[in-house]
């Protein structure tokens, strides 16, 4: 007996009902983004692995443990994208879009990470992604955070989230802080997890993000970044908070919220929820002024962005989305199939969704119409074809009509 074929572990089929919810989430998010001037673009799912090595760092968990990377037939190392930002910045540089700044860009699609599958975390998942390239100053950060708030509000999940906010300060602030953090962590070097022992020499701030309980206990008493802000960093953060207050954005300052990559600066944020267990983050982002230069651009481009998990948003509430209700055309007898096909085509030309059922007993075909929640059935038999009219059954009112084609269009459109 042949084994039943299954999808890869951590990769799920999106069936029509799932896709309906995904489509709705994307549509609402795109509409809100357009109010802020965002335009949609897409990048390839496959990139050269070095695109992500440069942007995320070879010592990051994503690159060292989670990326789907392999040699193609030309012996080039390529990777399935684990996130959008690197590809967007690569596209900005390779397409020479510097003269079009500022740019507000929206993307959506699948991303891939080889992680342990669980509720709200799969190996293939889908994201909404927003990047604001050429975003100068705290006012751009505040606008970006308000965009995130408005998206979650439009999707009716904002009330179940908390905006956690922090400032990573400028490069000088982070450099001073990193020295103090290393001094503190060196006293616990032998107790750190194996991953964090490596991070201690390569990127110690990543230890603050560690999921290890042992590491978390150690960093609970570590120095706090805000103690080492320069005056510039303090002013930037204070300005951001002022703008958020003006916009009515509620937030909680989380001094332990960091980004472990060198190109991140100033604003870092996450929208978290208690409704999804351990997978509590549904949207996260930050300012990344240094990334464009790391990716090969001559100048540093100020930028901020965020990504939201579509599957996680979908898990937060049940969306009751109206489906397109089709009209069913049912020919009575084989000699009426050709005419029924023509009628169905003419109805579609008037933007009326139509399904035509030609095989099986009439009772089964009518049952299919009921299963699809059809409001009307159009019967076409010898008499209807001869008289050039249609027999319409209204399934809600349980009434029948004999109408010509133009009157049929009027009835179907007003219903």
UniProtKB/Swiss-Prot annotation:
It comes from Rickettsia bellii (strain OSU 85-389). Homodimer. Belongs to the class-II aminoacyl-tRNA synthetase family. This is Histidine--tRNA ligase. It catalyses: tRNA(His) + L-histidine + ATP = L-histidyl-tRNA(His) + AMP + diphosphate + H(+). Keywords: Aminoacyl-tRNA synthetase, ATP-binding, Cytoplasm, Ligase, Nucleotide-binding, Protein biosynthesis. The gene is hisS. It is found in: Cytoplasm. NCBIfam families: hisS (TIGR00442). It comes from the Bacteria. It is an enzyme of class 6 (ligase). One of its GO terms (cellular component) is cytoplasm.
């Amino acid at each position: 007996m042949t084994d039943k074929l299954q999808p890869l572990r951590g990769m799920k089929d999106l069936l029509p009902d799932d896709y309906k919810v995904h489509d709705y989430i994307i549509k609402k998010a795109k509409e809100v983004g357009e109010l802020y001037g965002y335009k949609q673009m897409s990048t390839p799912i496959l990139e050269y692995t070095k695109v992500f090595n440069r942007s995320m760092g070879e010592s990051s968990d994503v690159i060292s443990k989670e990326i789907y990377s392999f040699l193609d037939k030309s012996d080039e190392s390529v990777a399935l994208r684990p996130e959008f930002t690197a590809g967007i910045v690569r596209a900005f540089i390779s397409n020479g879009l510097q003269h079009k700044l500022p740019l507000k860009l929206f993307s959506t699609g699948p991303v891939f990470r080889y992680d342990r599958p669980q509720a709200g975390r799969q190996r293939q998942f889908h994201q909404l992604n927003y990047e604001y390239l050429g975003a100068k100053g705290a006012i751009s950060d505040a606008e970006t955070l308000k965009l995130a708030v408005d998206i979650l509000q439009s999707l009716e999940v904002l009330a179940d989230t908390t905006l956690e906010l922090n400032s990573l300060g400028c490069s000088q602030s982070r450099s001073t802080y990193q020295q103090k953090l290393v001094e503190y962590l060196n006293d616990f070097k032998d107790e750190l997890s194996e991953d964090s022992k490596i991070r201690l020499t390569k990127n110690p701030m990543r230890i603050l993000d560690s999921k290890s309980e042992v590491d978390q206990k150690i960093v609970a008493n570590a120095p706090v970044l805000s103690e080492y802000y320069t005056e510039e960093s303090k002013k930037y953060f204070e300005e951001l908070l002022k703008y958020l207050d003006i916009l009515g954005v509620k937030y909680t300052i989380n001094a332990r919220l960091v980004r472990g990559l060198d190109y991140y600066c100033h604003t870092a944020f996450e929208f978290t929820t208690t409704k999804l267990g351990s997978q509590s983050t549904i949207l996260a982002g930050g300012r990344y002024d240094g990334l464009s230069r790391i990716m090969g651009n001559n100048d540093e481009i100020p930028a901020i962005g965020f990504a939201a998990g579509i599957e996680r948003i979908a898990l937060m509430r049940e969306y009751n989305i109206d489906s397109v209700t089709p009209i069913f055309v049912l020919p009575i007898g084989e000699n009426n199939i050709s005419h029924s096909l023509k009628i169905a085509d003419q109805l579609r030309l008037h933007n009326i969704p139509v399904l035509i059922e030609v095989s099986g007993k009439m009772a089964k075909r009518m049952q299919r119409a009921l299963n699809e929640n059809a409001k009307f059935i159009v019967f076409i038999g010898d008499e209807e074809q001869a008289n050039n009219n249609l027999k319409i059954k209204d399934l809600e009112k349980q009434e029948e009509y004999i109408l010509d084609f133009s009157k049929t269009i009027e009835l179907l459109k007003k219903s």
